[in-house]
Design a protein with these regions (language model features):
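N-terminal secretory signal peptides that target proteins for export/translocation
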Residues: 1-14
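Intrinsically disordered, low-complexity peripheral segments of secretory-pathway and membrane proteins
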Residues: 34-76, 83, 292-357
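Channel- or pocket-lining gating/hinge segments that regulate access to a cavity or pore
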Residues: 224-343
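N-terminal signal peptide c-region/cleavage motif recognized by signal peptidases
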Residues: 29-31
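Bacterial N-terminal signal peptides
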Residues: 18-27
Length: 357
């Protein structure tokens, strides 16, 4: 009898432990499942179709006109997100952009499936960008259109590119988002678009912005459309290279004048110097205030150096000519002129190549 009770007790304890284990496993599974659902952010697909883009280099801005669209799936009863909140996407580098810009610009909305949204609109406006003129006029620039939803962090919402649309449209991978109008007049506007890019990222804000309900460090998803441009070479050859070559050619003529023609040599060098200064001021007038030396400035500096050396050599050769009774001075003048004729273009060409590296 005692043995039967012992077996019954052991069986009851085993069932009890089994029940506790099963309950713990079930609870853990539910927690993991809930956590997985909670950690899965809403995916907001985005695309643009650029109709026009025009940079203003002096103001460090550009103007863009484009169609935009968003595609997303959302059951607000489960996510707690409304369509209006999801569309609170901002242009991070936009100028004078109103709040709820995308909601106000909607021109078409449809629902291809339950809780699925397709929304499109049109935007035209100005954007900031940071040009780099170090290699001007042979510089390359990057103009970005940056989207960010400041309402939900990256754990709740991420913005991704609608790459499927670009593939279906059979767009050139190097020119995604560009309209045929832009591509058709690509080389006729003083600059040339040589590629585009789309990148997804997140930005960390190390502030709660005074809201105690927020974490001190929050990450928000971003989508960046980039347009890369350079300048058409031929217009700048006629605008920059040819005038500077003419100025330096006038200075180079000094080395073919007789040593006693100091007045002609002085006139050529001084005129060339003043022309170079005025020319540099004219070119820099097309650029904003910048705090670094650009490529074209370096070419002008080497031009000033060559002009100054030419002026100094003219005076030296004139003084040697005054001592014409000394045959050694005539030979020295001849050698100096010969070396100057060789090194003058050599120094300038070397500087052009060296500064470009």
């Amino acid at each position: 009898m005692a043995s039967s009770k012992l077996k019954y007790t052991r069986l009851s304890v085993s069932k009890l432990f089994y029940g506790f284990g099963l309950a713990a496993i079930t609870l853990f599974s539910l927690q993991v499942s809930a956590q997985a659902k909670k950690s899965k952010p809403l995916v907001l697909k985005s695309g643009i179709y650029l109709k026009n883009i025009t940079p203003d280099f002096k103001a460090s801005t550009f103007r863009a006109e484009f169609y935009w669209w968003f595609i997303f799936e959302n059951d607000s009863s489960k996510t707690g997100m409304s369509k209006e909140d999801i569309l609170k996407v901002e242009f991070v580098n936009g100028i004078g952009v109103e709040a709820n810009v995308f909601t106000n610009e909607i021109i078409y909305e449809t629902h291809p499936a339950p809780n699925t949204y397709y929304i499109t609109g049109f935007h035209q406006g100005d954007f900031y960008f940071t040009p780099d003129f170090r290699m001007y006029p042979f510089d390359k620039q990057q103009m970005d259109i940056i989207l960010e939803n400041g309402q939900f962090d990256s754990d709740q919402l991420v913005i991704v590119a609608d790459t499927a649309s670009f593939k279906r449209s059979k767009q050139d991978p190097n020119f995604k988002t560009l309209s045929n109008d832009i591509l058709r007049k690509n080389n006729s506007r003083g600059f040339r678009i040589y590629k585009t890019d789309i990148s997804e990222s997140s930005i960390l804000y190390n502030s709660d912005f005074g809201d105690i309900s927020l974490e001190g460090n929050s990450s928000y998803g971003r989508l960046q459309y980039s347009v890369f441009i350079d300048r058409s070479i031929l217009p700048y050859i006629s605008k920059f290279v040819i005038p500077l070559m003419i100025i330096l050619l006038l200075v180079y003529f000094v080395y073919f004048l007789p040593s006693d023609k100091i007045d002609t040599a002085a006139a050529l060098t001084v005129t060339s110097l003043l022309s170079a200064i005025a020319f540099q001021s004219s070119i820099n007038g097309d650029l904003p205030e910048i705090g670094y030396v650009i490529y074209v400035d370096k070419l002008f500096y080497i031009s000033y150096f060559l002009i100054a050396v030419s002026m100094a050599l003219s005076l030296w050769l004139f003084n040697l000519d005054l001592q014409s009774d000394n045959p050694a001075n005539k030979e020295k003048s001849r050698k100096i002129l010969l070396l100057a004729r060789i090194f003058f273009p050599l120094i300038f060409i070397s500087a052009v190549i060296l500064f470009a590296l």
